Every structure is written in structure tokens, then in C-alpha cells.
Amino acid sequence: MSFDAARWNQGKLRVHLIGVAGSGMTPLAEILLDLGHEVTGSDLKPAPARIIQRGVGFSLGQAAGGIGPVDVVVASAAIPDENVEWMEAKKRGLVRLRRAEVLGQLARGKKLLAVLGSHGKTTTATMVAQIFHEAGENPSFYLGGYAPALGASGRWGKGDWLIAEVDESEGAPTQLKPWAALLLNADYEHVDRYANEKAVIAAYQQILGNVAGPVIVVAKEETAAMDAAGSVKQKVTFGWEKSEADYLGSWEGENAEGIRFGVKGKGKDLGTFAVAATGRHNGGNALGGLAMAAELGIAPEKIRQGLQAFRRAERRFEILVSEPALEVVDDYAHHPKEVMATWKAAQARGRERIVAIFQPHRYTRLATFMTAFAEALAKADLVVLLPVYAAGEREMEGFGVAELAAKIGELGGKVEVAGSMPECRTILGKVWQEGDLFLFMGAGDVTQLAKKVARDFGTFRAVRDLVKGEGVVKWYEPMNKHTTIRIGGPAQVWFEPESEEALGRVVRWCGKEGVPLTVVGRGSNLLVRDGGIGGVCVHFGQPGMSKIEAEGGKIRAGAGARLKQIVSVAKANGIMGLEFMEGIPGALGGAMRMNAGAMESWTFEAVESVRVMNREGKVSEVARGDFEVKYRKVPRLVEDIAVGAVLHGKPGKPEEIAEKLKQYSRKRWDSQPAAPSAGCIFKNAEKIPAGRLIEELGLKDTSVGGARISPVHGNFIVNQGGAKAVDVLRLMEKVQARARKDRGIDLEPEVIVVGEDE
């Protein structure tokens, strides 16, 4: 359906953006809002909060019903023709436009300043927009990342200029007619579209052929860019010393505040310019933006003010954390040249080590530049590789992270491979050293990991400072080491207190700061989700919280005391009645919270009193009679923390106790699987034990992924190797659905499920 471009300025339209959270669609949403249009959008990832706050109706996920009563539907080239919403728009006869078409239509009413290049477009376009803003030009801008100093990634201003980065990844946008253009470089990129470097140069030549006014192009150091601009008449060059460019920069240095360089413009000394950016490559970007602004009549002093006001665009060497213990930097680098330039900028920060966390973007790009990526990454002190962000591409055998890791190793680099984001966090927690710089790079969702690591480190550092050596504090401790089923992502902060006083300090801090606090015992009857446990995870593994003493026919024990050890001490002191605990693979604290049982006996039958800490860090001794005790649950101990208890038994001879233990051991080995498990997975139903029900349903030996219902006991799910929490949960759902359908029984989980999904 045809669409008159003038309609964008002739009253409100209802516009739906497919993929609104993308870096090319979010600025378009902001521009359309500025023009007074009603905007809705959908995406498979969350949209920036700022556009939702401005009124964009956002839907997470895409469906035919996701398009309401709208006039226009817009999608980027990344959205395939078979996208369900794109197809629905066609079915309904709605106006359908690609993002580049809309940008071209909007640009007709402005003087378009196009920023071009394989790298550096967002940073440079942001610099130019900032210069024009400070010069009072009230420009419109369209940027590939959020500009903090401008408060948006897209804006429709009242001035004549539209500053836009123009992406060549979709081919030469012939519908654009720039008034002026800035070409930063023309490296071989987007290998899924262009066969070779000549094809890339040809695309830029086509774009530059449509430019009405000056073309600012980087000088000799970028020969491909000069080739692309070879036939341009109004060509103005910029570059560093010895390039003989029209705008000649001289590097003056870099410090914590940014970079400084001097400029001579067409033989005239323009003075020194400073910009809050890192690295010589960003100095080149600033020099190019300066040249464009100067050629379009912006005074040097206004340019200087604009560059001083500039703040890095989102994900362009964005420093998320900077403190002596750790610096975390997030960057969009996804081409070997970008990786190299970003590493050089990181090196200039003067940290102890650089740990590069890299997520390759597209298999085609990795396959084409495998060796170049390895050479750039091997310069880091340590490389952690994430799975390839496919961006819709199919996997290419022989061109994955395993091959990249091997090449880095051949070059002498140290490398670790993470199979997932949670595994990467586990690796980072293991390798972190005081003074490190964590450099996250990639064009995919690695940015979410970078932001999480930056946030989580603050919690880790705060807890470590609170503890003051009275216990163990670890960052990103893998929970599969601490659960009997050997499953679970990392704990954000793992804390083993040595004393009640240290525990109380952390408990009070968590309550004040709103940080989740989870207490885990020996990890039986516990399933930790694959994303791990957020906040602080407390484990009573230190001697100060796991003491066991026998006195007057009773046992006083800390919450961290292993049940097996409690039984051993009881036996040595002639205390009978605790033998059932010997086979429960847990600690006292967890056993009390769950009222764990075995051999027809229950933990709270042996409890005389419990020492508890509330969430304000206050400790009190509570008698057994003051607790409500339920099947597999003691409600008060879900909130309050059991830090110890007094247990009672009856007098018994050691040989009698030993015989009882042998009987229980034989029974347990005959009826329970030896493979890693969380113990009984479901509570018994009112009329039938869960294990027997599962057996009668014919579900023994059923598996999902690496999780399997034990052939020995139907109420045990075992980890047969490499199982994930999601496998166990899906298998549990399968059992519950079958029990409900065939028997009308709702099976309630006995296992406690904690944490967040991957």
C-alpha cells in the first residue's frame, strides 16, 4: 500500500513498531513520539524503560493479536517476512514500511547529515548531535545508542538539521539524499550481505553519490574509505599527523577525564579540544565530527563546548563500575578492528589485568574473521568466550567458540569457554583478582551480563566489608557444588559466617538495603534454578556455626552441624533416638526448617529448643512447643533463621545404637538410588505415597534432558549427567500433569525450588 511521506507531519498516526527494543527502532519510536504519533511496539526482549514511560504501549513477545487498531506497521530489515505480526499487517491491508524507508521519508523535511562507517558511527553521530545542540541549532537526531547528555537516542527538533547514523548492513539506502556525509572507515563487514571489501566500498560509493554537499572522509590511514570517496567532488579530509589531511589532528594524551588533541583546520590553528572518551580511535571520531561541524559553519568555540558536553553513548566503552578492586566496561565491539581498538583503550586505563569477555556476533562474521579475532583477543590477560549470538543465522560447523578458543590458545592467550551466561558469571567469580578490568564486548545480549556483573559486584564488596574476616565471602559461587543433585547456577554472594555476630550484621544490612537473603544447608531437598540465587546466600559451613556438644543426655549443635556427625556424637555419648538422622544428607538447620524425616521419624520429635535469628539480626531461644510444625514444613523457620538447637534422646548403649544404624542403612540402600538426587521430589498424597503413584502411572525411568525418574524409587529424580534445573522442573510438570489427568491427584513438591531462570 502506498504511503505519502508528508503524512508524518500531518496529524496523529497510530504506528506499531516490530522489534521496538532494537538499537535502530528505539530512536525511531522517540522521534515518532516527538511528532505526536501514538506508538505501540513489540519485541522478544524488554524495551527501554524511557520509551514506555513516554507512552509506548509495549508487548513482550510477538503474536498476530499484538497489532491493535493502527495505521502503519514498521519493521527493521532484521524482521523476516514470515514474522507473525508482519504477516498479520499484510493480511489486514495495513501500510507496511521498513525502518530505512521511514528514516528516508522523515529526512525529506530536514538537511540530513549522514554518519557512515563500519565502526564508530554511534559515538561520532552522538558527538555531532551534541555539537549542534550546544551551538543552539536544535537538531533532530537518530542514534544507535542512548546518549546520556542528550537524554535520548532519537529526537525531532525544530532546527533544520537531522543527524543520523546510516547503517550499511541493509545495503545502500538509496532512498536517503544526504545534505552532507561523514565517512569514518570502510572496512569489510556484514559478510552475510557483502562478498568482499570491494562490495563494501561499492555500497559506500552508491551512498556518497547521493550527497548534495560536502563529504568529510578520513584520510590516508583508512585507504578503503578514501577509495569509497574517490570520485566525490566536495571532499574534505581529516586525520592524524603526517596524513596531510585538511583537518589535521595532533594527539596530546589521555587521562581519567578523557582525551585531548590539537587541530589545524585547513592550515588554521583551531586550538586544543577535550572530550570525555577513551582511546586514540575515539579521538579520530571526534576529529571527524569536528571537521563536519566546522565545514557546516559551526564556530570552533561552539565545537569545543559540544565536545566537552559529550558523554559516551550507551555501550561505547561504557564504564559501569570503576573502583580499585574492579572496573567493568561494556562495549559494542564486534569486529576485530573494534576489539583491538577497545583493548587499547582498556590498556590505557592502567589496571592490573584485562579480562576480556567476548560474545561473537553471527557465525558468518566469526567464520570470516576467525584469525583476526583470535589475534585481537589474545592480547588480553584472560579471555572468556560466550556462545555465538546467532542473530537468526544457522550454526556453522567448525566455526564456533571452541575453534576460536583453540586459535587464541595457539597464540599464547589464556582462554576459558562459558556455555551460558550463568556459567560465565561462575568463571568470573573464580578468576577475579583485585585491580582487574572486566571488558565485555559484543553486539548481542552480552550487555545484560555486563550490567548484572557490575551490579552484583557492589553487593559482594559490601558484604565482604561487613564481614571483616569473620567468615568466608565468595562471588558467584557455583551452587552445583552445594546441592546433592549437583545442579544450580551461581550464588551472587556466598557467605559462610564464623559467628552469630557476623551473620547478624549481614542480615540487618540485607533488610535495610532490600537485598534478598537465602539460607541453604547441605543442599538436599533443594533445587537451584539455572540462573542461580540472587542476593546473599548463607551457608553455615564454618566451625563457629557447626559445633556439636553433648551434655546431660542432650545435644547442643549449631545449624551447620551435619546430621551424620550429630548422630556420631550422640552414639559416643549413649544418646539414643537420633539414628534416623544418619542417612539424611543434610545439616541441622535445613532439617529443622523442612522437619526432615526418615524411617518414620521426624526432626522436630527430637527438638527441645531452637536458637533463632530474626531478620533484624536478634537472637532468641524458642521452646519446641512454640513452633507450629507441619508435614515437611515449619512456617516460622521460613522467615526466621535457625542458628542452632538443643536435641534430646534417651539413654542407650552404643552397641544398640550401632545395630539400629546398620538396620536403617540396609533399608536405605535397598530403596534409594545412588545417583545424585535432591531426595524425595514430591510430598506424599493423602491416599497414596508419591513414589508408588509414580510407579503405577508407569513413569519410572522417564527422562527430560539430563534428568531422569529413578528406576529404583519413583519419587526420586536423579541427575544422570549434565542435567539442568529446567530439565528437572519439566519432568516434575510432566508427572504432575499425568497424576492430575489419570488420578485426579495434585502432587505438591517436597523439594524447595529457589533462584532465577537462566
Please provide the spans of the model-predicted regions.
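A gly/ser-rich beta-alpha-beta helix-loop segment of oxidoreductase catalytic cores
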Residues: 113-118, 564-608, 677
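Phosphate-binding loop of NTP-binding sites
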Residues: 6-11, 31-37, 52, 65-66, ...
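Anion-binding (especially nucleotide phosphate/pyrophosphate-binding) glycine-rich loop
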Residues: 463-588
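C-terminal helical cap/extension that packs against the catalytic core
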Residues: 374-434
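Structural signature of FAD isoalloxazine-binding scaffolds in flavoprotein oxidoreductases
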Residues: 488, 495-500, 527-546, 593-623, ...
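NAD(P)-binding Rossmann-fold cofactor-contacting core
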Residues: 37-50
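Nucleotide phosphate-binding/pyrophosphate-handling subdomain across enzymes
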Residues: 3-16, 24, 28-31, 35, ...
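Phosphate/pyrophosphate- and phosphate-bearing ligand-binding catalytic cores of soluble enzymes
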Residues: 475, 526, 613-730, 734-758
